[in-house]
Swiss-Prot record:
NCBIfam families with a match to the protein in the record: PRK00753.1
HAMAP family: PSII_PsbL
Membrane topology, from the record: Single-pass membrane protein
Designated name of the protein: Photosystem II reaction center protein L
Source organism of the structure: Trichodesmium erythraeum (strain IMS101)
Subcellular location: Cellular thylakoid membrane
Gene name linked to the record: psbL
Amino acid sequence: MPLDRNNNPNQQPVELNRTSLYLGLLLVFVVGILFSSYFFN
């Protein structure tokens, strides 16, 4: 597992950055909807 991570150090950060951005947006959206539901209830 550690070898795999050190094998593609150039492709890891790019994918991680994109995934992080998408995940962050999705997380914010889900959290917002959850909070809205709680507040509306």
